[in-house]
Amino acid sequence: MAKKSLIQREKKRQKLEQKYHLIRQSLKKKIRSKVSPLSLSEKTKMREKLQSLPRNSAPTRLHRRCFLTGRPRANYRHFGLSGHVLREMVYECLLPGATRSSW
């Protein structure tokens, strides 16, 4: 089981990412726009605004975690579980439609 502080830190990052998502997205669109090209000085100002946002608001800082154990590795997106928990739940028939492989 992951430490509670790490799980809380990840939740805090998710909230920050949601809060600044639209701001970050609009700044990136303005920098990349080819319809109305910006001058070099305007682009640098936009980049400075982008860099002034909190680091933890960037989506690359997020990490998927198992919602039962908080484990950050070997997560299956479809289930939101780590491989260990997924395997145990399949063996106990707690996931409908998932079966053990046999050949």
Swiss-Prot record:
Segments passing through the bilayer: none
Record has Mitochondrion as a keyword: no
Localisation per UniProt entry: Plastid, Chloroplast
Gene this protein is translated from: rps14
HAMAP family in the record: Ribosomal_uS14_1 (MF_00537)
Subunit annotation: Part of the 30S ribosomal subunit.
InterPro entries: Ribosomal_uS14, Ribosomal_uS14_bac/plastid, Ribosomal_uS14_CS
Protein name: Small ribosomal subunit protein uS14c
Organism: Triticum aestivum
Gene Ontology cellular-component terms listed: chloroplast; small ribosomal subunit
Taxonomic classification: Eukaryota, Viridiplantae, Streptophyta, Embryophyta, Tracheophyta
